[in-house]
Amino acid sequence: MIPALDIDSLEHRLVAGDRAALARAITLVESRRADHQVAARTLLSRLMPLTGRAQRIGITGVPGAGKSTTIERFGCNLVEAGHRVAVLAVDPSSGRHGGSILGDKTRMEQLSVQANAFIRPSPSGGALGGVARKTREAMLLCEAAGFDVVIIETVGVGQSETVVADMVDIFLALLIPGGGDELQGIKKGLIELADLLVINKADADPAKAERSARDYRNALHILTPAHPDWTPPVLTASGLTGQGLDVLWTQILRHREVMTANGARAARRADQDARWMWAMVRDRLEDAFKTAPAVAALVPDLETAVREGEVPASAAADRLLAAFGL
């Protein structure tokens, strides 16, 4: 167990805005050690009253949409305007190849050196649920440290868009200018998740970008909006030149104003918290199950038998559950 005095010191330094303390606290919540997890829960419980005041922004994008460039320029603009900006990532594949955000941190040289900015690579290893848990806790720590804008990036792998959308106030999709073929290629689910669409790289061909924006606006008309008071705007912008990023921030603030006034923002966060509670229950139960000695002793042989078709998955599951006492 980490001594209580260390947790006290870490808490005080983090609340004072110490980025090194914030990084250490995030490392603590990412740890799989049982004593570290207990300490992390203690720290988070103490800090909860200081969370919830930040604008939580999720950003995803199609390949080549210029997410890193846009996030850096957008973040720098917000810092210059007096905000404190944290950038986190959800990358369930980071345990295999290091995660794109590691490269992003290197490329975000201007933002990373800002005193009022904090960039954190995706936690490595584990399934998407575990990565999401660590990222959500990192978001709360950033808020407690005084960051009033938290940007969570998804690399767009599998269900990561849904996971990120379920921990933020507004979810942005970065797209690239294109014609009908490109429009058809965009996943409908991504468009339905987005609260705001941005046609990026508009500086290269403004007319083409505007045509794409018009196409997406038309496409949105056939979809039922997630909330009757909000139709997702479709903007054009350039992360390279900064064009349109001021309008983007204005729309984010408008979304917050509308959703706060009608109660949807509070309801969205309440629903997220309830789902988060059950996700934590599942996560803790799975950890307890997999680390139980009786279960761990059976897993290698049963996994091999299932893979080779010798034992049905349902029968193997029954044996594991019985070993756990269920």
UniProtKB/Swiss-Prot annotation:
Its EC number is 3.6.-.-. It holds the Pfam family MeaB. It is an enzyme of class 3 (hydrolase). GO terms for molecular function: ATP binding; ATP hydrolysis activity; GTP binding; GTPase activity. One of its GO terms (cellular component) is cytoplasm. The keyword Glycoprotein does not apply. Keywords: ATP-binding, Chaperone, GTP-binding, Hydrolase, Nucleotide-binding. GTP binds at G61, V62, P63, G64, A65, G66, K67, S68, T69, D203, S238, G239, L240. PANTHER family: METHYLMALONIC ACIDURIA TYPE A PROTEIN, MITOCHONDRIAL, METHYLMALONYL-COA MUTASE. Belongs to the SIMIBI class G3E GTPase family. ArgK/MeaB subfamily. NCBIfam families: lao, PRK09435.1. May have GTPase activity. May also bind and hydrolyze ATP. May function as chaperone. This is Putative GTPase CC_2483. It comes from Caulobacter vibrioides (strain ATCC 19089 / CIP 103742 / CB 15) (Caulobacter crescentus). The lineage of its organism: Bacteria, Pseudomonadati, Pseudomonadota, Alphaproteobacteria, Caulobacterales.
